[in-house]
């Protein structure tokens, strides 16, 4: 995606099972442990080396991106936190993250702004986007700051405190020649929302809105849209004996973002919220996940999503800056929800209509190995501008699995977002049931019986031999659009660019009991897909400051302990 000063947005980037057997911490293959360097923050927001027992909180950051693909951030606030003094703890949480991760955040910001804004200065950000940011942030702060009519209101305020603390922490720690403005740091939080904010601004500035809405996209445009904006593959899998329940997520994104991945464990012992500890995959400088992949040990829930791109541009009329963007709502839903249905209800409040996803929520509290699935174990919600639909899909999951692949499930959402219209025009590539990934999941998931099987399917790309790929490396559970190639038909399947699968994360009932996931960072590597390298052909196409040069990492265990 490029955002240029004329504000014409061009979204093309050149760019047999035993549950007791999963004990990854005992397997050298997954070992990542090195002693961390602790820092503590006091009530004056002074950061000192060491883990000080009477501090506001403490944490560490291990920048191991070049080692295994992931930074590891641990931030924990002190148990002395009360409802009356909660705001300072949320602010301190953000401050410590900004302080500890500033160097990786700087690298990510330079790549982010260069690739998305064509420049790294605040003046390079298009004026309409700056205006949207300011209107949205002013609305949020004026509506919710110092308002405590509900726990929800308080948590919106706490997200504001956390972000402002993050900005202060970054600015305090960063070198004088690597400073970022608060506006720039706020724009990093838009990583998920940005494309739909851009779509809304395009719609608003269209001279003839009727013509803009009614213009029919070509198959080439649709395929390019899916390639550069279609984000992620997801899978929830119950084994045939009901002995284990897996949930997994493979992020699709711009390749440069793979260089700044951080797994974060954030513990804020707020007595007013159930979700006070969260382990999630994220990026430097981003307070939420953006993938998304959240594990919430305190409520025993895991949440993932895949994106449903907006094909019906008339929906952008329902986007408004007077709303809560995804990055705020995701944090609040994680904190306030104790059940999957509660999560859907909390997430959809003040819906911005940006980052329209299919969200999947597994409530492991309701899961007992080798027993039938209980109602409300698994919910989904699909959001779009101006609306949403949600439902308990446990009965469907009980049949074996729930796959997710950037197509809306609910017929009403499918129709409203424009998919039914374009399916009639262009056929199976748009279809929920017959698109390549849908057929791959349907064919291959019955063979997945173990953690190894989950790893294999979520990084799968056999485009040279898989008939459902048709010779195209983008038609895979883990796409590799950089490789090129494709079938003779349709001729428009020719997109080549720096986009595709950039990671995979998996957890399960037994892993969640240990606060564990496994993860791999980098563009998928298979017999058909060699390791991606920032060679001379690609290095000038996409900024990637400080990124690993070659992505050929292994799976690792993610725990991020307090030891």
Swiss-Prot record:
E.C. designation(s): 3.1.1.-
Primary location recorded for the protein, binned into one broad class: secreted
Keywords attached to this entry: Glycoprotein, Hydrolase, Lipid degradation, Lipid metabolism, Secreted, Signal
InterPro entries: PLipase_B-like
Signal peptide start and end residues: 1-21
Residues with attached carbohydrate: 85, 107, 118, 121, 208, 312, 537
UniProt-annotated location(s): Secreted
A Gene Ontology term for the protein's cellular component: extracellular region
GO BP, sorted A to Z: phosphatidylethanolamine catabolic process; phosphatidylinositol catabolic process; phospholipid catabolic process
Record flagged with keyword Signal: yes
Pfam families, per the entry: Phospholip_B (PF04916)
One MF term in the entry's GO annotations: phospholipase activity
UniProt keyword Transcription, yes or no: no
Domain of life: Eukaryota
Role noted for this protein: Probable phospholipase.
Family stated for the protein in its record: Belongs to the phospholipase B-like family.
Protein's name according to its UniProt entry: Phospholipase B-like protein F
């Amino acid at each position: 995606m490029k955002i240029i000063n004329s504000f014409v947005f061009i979204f093309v980037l050149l760019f047999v099972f035993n549950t007791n057997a999963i004990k990854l911490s005992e397997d050298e293959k997954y070992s990542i442990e090195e002693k961390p360097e602790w820092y503590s923050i006091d009530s004056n927001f002074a950061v000192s080396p060491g883990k000080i027992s009477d501090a506001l909180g403490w944490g560490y950051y291990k920048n191991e991106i070049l080692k295994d693909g992931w930074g590891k951030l641990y931030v924990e606030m002190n148990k002395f936190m009360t409802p009356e003094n909660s705001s300072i703890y949320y602010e301190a949480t953000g401050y410590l993250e900004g302080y500890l991760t500033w160097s990786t955040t700087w690298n990510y910001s330079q790549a982010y702004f260069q690739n998305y804004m064509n420049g790294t200065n605040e003046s390079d950000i298009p004026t309409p986007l700056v205006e949207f940011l300011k209107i949205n942030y002013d609305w949020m702060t004026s509506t919710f700051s110092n308002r405590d009519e509900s726990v929800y209101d308080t948590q919106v305020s706490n997200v504001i405190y956390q972000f402002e603390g993050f900005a202060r922490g970054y600015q305090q720690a960063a070198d004088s020649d690597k400073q970022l403005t608060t506006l720039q740091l706020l724009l990093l939080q838009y990583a998920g929302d940005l494309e739909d904010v851009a779509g809304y601004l395009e719609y608003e500035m269209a001279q003839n809105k009727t013509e803009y809405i009614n213009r029919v996209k070509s198959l080439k445009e649709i395929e390019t849209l899916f390639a550069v904006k279609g984000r992620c593959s997801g899978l929830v899998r119950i084994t045939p004996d009901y002995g284990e329940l897996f949930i997994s997520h493979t992020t699709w994104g711009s390749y440069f973002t793979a260089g700044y991945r951080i797994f974060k464990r954030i513990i804020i012992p707020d007595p007013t919220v159930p979700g006070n500890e969260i382990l999630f995959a994220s990026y430097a400088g981003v307070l939420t996940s953006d993938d998304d992949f959240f594990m919430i040990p305190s409520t025993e829930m895991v949440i993932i999503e895949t994106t449903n791109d907006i094909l019906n541009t008339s929906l952008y009329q329902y986007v408004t800056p007077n709303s809560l963007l995804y990055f705020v709502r995701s944090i609040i839903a994680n904190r306030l929800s104790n059940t999957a249905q509660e999560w859907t209800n909390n997430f959809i409040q003040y819906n911005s209509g940006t980052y329209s996803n299919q969200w999947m929520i597994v409530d492991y509290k309701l899961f007992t190995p080798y027993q039938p699935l209980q109602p409300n174990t698994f919910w989904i919600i699909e959001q779009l501008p101006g609306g949403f639909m949600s439902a308990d899909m446990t009965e469907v999951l009980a049949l074996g699995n729930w796959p997710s692949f950037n197509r809306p499930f609910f017929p009403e959402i499918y129709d409203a977002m424009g998919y039914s219209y374009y399916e009639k025009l262009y056929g199976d590539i748009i279809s929920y049931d017959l698109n390549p990934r849908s057929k791959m999941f349907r064919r291959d998931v019955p063979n997945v019986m173990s953690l190894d099987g989950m790893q294999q399917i979520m990084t799968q790309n056999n485009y040279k031999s898989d008939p459902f790929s048709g010779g195209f490396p983008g038609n895979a559970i883990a796409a590799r659009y950089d490789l090129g190639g494709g079938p003779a038909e349709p001729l428009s399947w020719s997109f080549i660019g720096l986009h595709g699968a950039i990671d995979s994360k998996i957890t399960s009932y037994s892993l969640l009991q240990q606060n564990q996931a496994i993860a791999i960072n980098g563009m998928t590597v298979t017999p058909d897909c060699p390791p991606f390298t920032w060679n001379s052909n690609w290095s000038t196409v996409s900024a990637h400051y400080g990124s690993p040069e070659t992505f050929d990492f292994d799976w690792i265990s993610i725990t991020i302990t307090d030891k």
